[in-house]
Curated annotation (Swiss-Prot):
Organism: Mannheimia succiniciproducens (strain KCTC 0769BP / MBEL55E)
Protein name per Swiss-Prot or TrEMBL: Histidinol-phosphate aminotransferase 2
InterPro entries: Aminotrans_II_pyridoxalP_BS, Aminotransferase_I/II_large, HisP_aminotrans, PyrdxlP-dep_Trfase, PyrdxlP-dep_Trfase_major, PyrdxlP-dep_Trfase_small
Protein encoded by which gene: hisC2
Pathway: Amino-acid biosynthesis; L-histidine biosynthesis; L-histidine from 5-phospho-alpha-D-ribose 1-diphosphate: step 7/9
EC number: 2.6.1.9
NCBIfam families hit by this protein: hisC (TIGR01141)
Amino acid sequence: MSISQLSRKNVQALTPYQSARRLGGNGDVWLNANEYPTSPDFNLSERIFNRYPEPQPEAVIKGYAAYADVKPENVIVTRGGDESIELLIKGFCEPEDKVLYCPPTYGMYAVSAETLGIATKTVPLTEDFQLDLPEIEKNLAGVKVIFVCSPNNPTGNVLNQADLIRLLDITAGSAIVVVDEAYIEFSPETSMIKQLGNYPHLAIIRTLSKAFALAGLRCGFTLANPELIGVLQKVIAPYPLPVPVSDIAAQALQPQGVAQMKMRVADVLANRAWLIGELKQIPSVVKIFATEANYVLVKFQDGEKVFNALWEKGIILRDQHKAFGLKNCIRISIGTRAELEKTVVALKLA
C-alpha cells in the first residue's frame, strides 16, 4: 500500500489550493495575488527568540482592537485570515455539519472544509454578484458555518448590508455567519463591524496582508463576541504567532503605521481609477466589473489568450476563466503606476 493510500479518504480526493505563488511564473510584474506592490520597512525591536511567544500577544491584540474600534476581548490573532477560516470550521462543525459559501468567491472556504472532512453547500451569487437570499434560506438545513466575502474576491464588489443583516436574522441560533473583510480598508464604510454587538453569531475576518502591505507576515484576525472568541481559543495552536511577526504587527498598528496604511489605500485607489480609465479604451475588453478592492475583474473577448500573452511577457495576472460564472475573466491586482502602464501596453497588443 502506498503512502498516499494511507492518507484519509477525503484528503486523497483533494487538489491543493492553487495560490498565486503555487501557479508560478517567471514574471517581473506580479499582479496576481492582490498584494501591495512595495514593502514597508520595519526594524525588529524584540530580539528574544529562545522563549516561546505569547499565545495572543497583548500589543497586537490591543493595537488591532484600537484600530477596529472594538474591545480586546473581541479579537483573536491568527496566522493570516486563512487560519481564521480553519478555526471557525474546527470550532463549530461536527462531522455531519455543512459549510455554505457563495461562488464565485475565495477558494479557501471550500479547501478548508474539505480538508477537515466537512461537506459543503454552494449557493451561487446572483448575476450582479449579490447574495441569493431565497436560495440560501432553502439550503440552510445542516449548515453550521456560512462564509461570505465583502468586498468579494475575485469580483471586487461589496455585498448589500441589508442582505447581510437579513442573513444574520435567518441564521440566528443555528449557524455562524462569517464575513471575510480582508479588503475592507479599501471600502471601510461598508464594514459589518458595528453589528458585532447585535449578532453573537457574527464573525469578521481581517488581515494585515492587503492594505497594510504585510502579506509575507501571515497575520490575520477574527473579530466576534467574547463567547465566540472563546471557542476559537480552544482550537487554535498554542503559539500561533512567531515573535518577529507579532513585533512587526504591533508596529504596523501604531498610529503612524495606520496613517501609512491609509496613504497606501489612497495610492491604490488613484492607480485603480487610472487603470479602469485605460481599460475602457482597449477593444478586447468586454466588461470591467465595479470594484471596491485593490484589484479589478475584467472580462475579455478571449481571456485565456490575453492571460497567456501577458504571461509570456512576464506580466502575471490571475486567470479566473475556470471560476464559477467568470469565463474569459482576468483579475488584475493594482500595482505601481509603472507596472500598470506596462500591463496596459501589453493588453493593447494581446
